[in-house]
Regions:
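Short, glycine-/Ser/Thr-/acidic-enriched flexible segments
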Residues: 1, 32, 119, 151, ...
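Structured binding elements
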Residues: 180, 184-185
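Residue-level marker of structural boundaries
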Residues: 12-15, 19, 43, 75-76, ...
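Core hydrophobic alpha-helical membrane-spanning segments
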Residues: 49-50, 189
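Interfacial helix-loop-helix hairpins and adjacent transmembrane helices
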Residues: 163-179, 205-226
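Hydrophobic transmembrane alpha-helices and their membrane-interface caps
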Residues: 54-140, 145-164, 172, 190, ...
Length: 226
């Protein structure tokens, strides 16, 4: 049991109680710490996004590609929420929040690798944009999957509440250390797995979108007569 799950049950119980209107109920202790932690993590998340956006704009000199790269952060956050929902797990303001902030710096690497390969191919080739995107995806498919897979495999023992003590030569289950850090590992696994798959689907679509829009406009634009 976690403080968050116990608090939710207690809040549901309070709703069905006949409490006088002049009595205010406030939750302190762990709940107050959770609120403060969530505020801190939210501020850290916003600052990290702003710093990454500034760095990516200066590096790629392209606002649209910067937006595509940062879309991985949205995908990873959605993956975390979806994973918590599927496995009926509680959102920890501190550990899950730290995991989301950490993911912001991890998952953008896949998009950076893919878009950088696309830019390199585009600078050396005059092929159709779809052909260039397919080549970039073919070149970076294995690196993206390998880096994501190795990260997830390394975190699986901790996510399953296993801790390994190499000095004592022991493998413990549901220990204090593993229970405390399991939400962080689970958060990163959900975010990376969801983002890695959708990156190879959504990013190529977003890269081809400007050219596709231009084709549609040129197709329906009325011809001008002298």
């Amino acid at each position: 049991f976690t403080p968050e799950s116990r608090l939710k049950l207690f809040e549901k119980w309070i709703k069905y109680q006949s409490i006088p209107a002049n009595i205010d109920i406030e939750f302190g202790g762990d709940n107050e710490e959770q609120v403060n932690s969530l505020n801190f993590v939210t501020q850290a998340f916003i600052i990290s996004i702003m710093l990454m956006a500034a760095l990516l704009v200066t590096q790629f000199n392209n606002f649209y590609q910067m937006t595509i790269i940062l879309s991985a952060v949205v995908l990873s956050t959605a993956g975390v929420m979806l994973g918590l929902l599927i496995f009926d797990q509680v959102f920890s303001a501190l550990l899950t929040g730290i995991g989301i902030v950490s993911l912001a710096g991890i998952v953008v690497n896949n998009n950076i690798i893919l878009i950088d390969s696309f830019n390199v191919i585009s600078s050396k080739s005059n092929e159709d944009v779809r052909t260039r995107i397919i080549k970039a995806c073919a070149q970076r498919l294995r690196p993206i999957f390998l880096t994501s897979l190795t990260t997830m495999l390394g975190l699986i023992p901790l996510a399953l509440n296993y801790s390994i003590d190499p000095i004592a030569r022991e493998i413990a289950y549901d220990s204090n250390a593993s229970t405390s850090w399991a939400p962080l590992a689970q958060c990163i696994i959900y975010g990376i797995s969801f983002s890695a798959i959708l990156t190879l689907v959504l990013t190529p679509c977003l890269l081809v979108l400007p050219d596709h829009i231009k084709e549609i406009i040129s197709k329906y634009r009325k011809p001008s007569f002298a």
